[in-house]
Regions:
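Soluble metallo-hydrolase cores and metallopeptidase-like ectodomains found primarily
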Residues: 4-13
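Acidic, metal/ion-coordinating pockets
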Residues: 1-5, 21
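Metallo-beta-lactamase
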Residues: 12-90, 94
Length: 139
């Protein structure tokens, strides 16, 4: 917990899935797992268990019942608040199904683009698909 001008700011989550919780404002700030308006970065979550940990982190954010949520990754005009958290959960669930339904990164990328045609960061989608499908190593 940090203190800033008599306000507590809690660092929540684990490892790379941390976010800041400001209890007095009921606000989640900079939650790495929360994205909106873009394809989620999947290169850091190559295994199903990794993606399930992200969903668990998102569910822990929802359990706080925040009034304000500022996504860590988003485009201008994209939904914020619980809409962004729910979007991220739905995207991860769709991605998991698409991973099982496709043979390679190209198929995975195309299927996700078909399901989410308006999202930005297609290059991130394509790179992550290569890592998830074992066609590329990511540090």
């Amino acid at each position: 917990t940090l203190k800033l001008e008599n306000e507590s700011i809690e660092i929540k989550g684990k490892k790379e899935l941390t976010y800041l919780w400001v209890p007095s404002a009921k606000a989640v700030v900079g939650g790495i797992p929360v994205s909106s308006g873009i394809h989620l970065w999947m290169a850091d979550t190559p295994k199903t268990k990794d993606r399930m940990e992200v969903i668990q982190s998102l569910e822990s954010i929802k359990a706080l019942q925040p009034k304000i949520i500022v996504p860590a990754h988003m485009v201008e005009g994209a939904p914020q608040g619980l809409d962004a958290v729910n979007f991220s959960i739905n995207y991860l669930n769709s991605y998991e199904k698409a991973t099982k339904a496709t043979k390679n990164a190209t198929e995975l990328s195309k299927l996700m683009q078909k399901q989410y045609p308006t999202l930005q960061s297609v290059d991130s989608l394509e790179l992550g698909a290569k890592v998830v499908k074992g066609e590329m190593q990511w540090p």
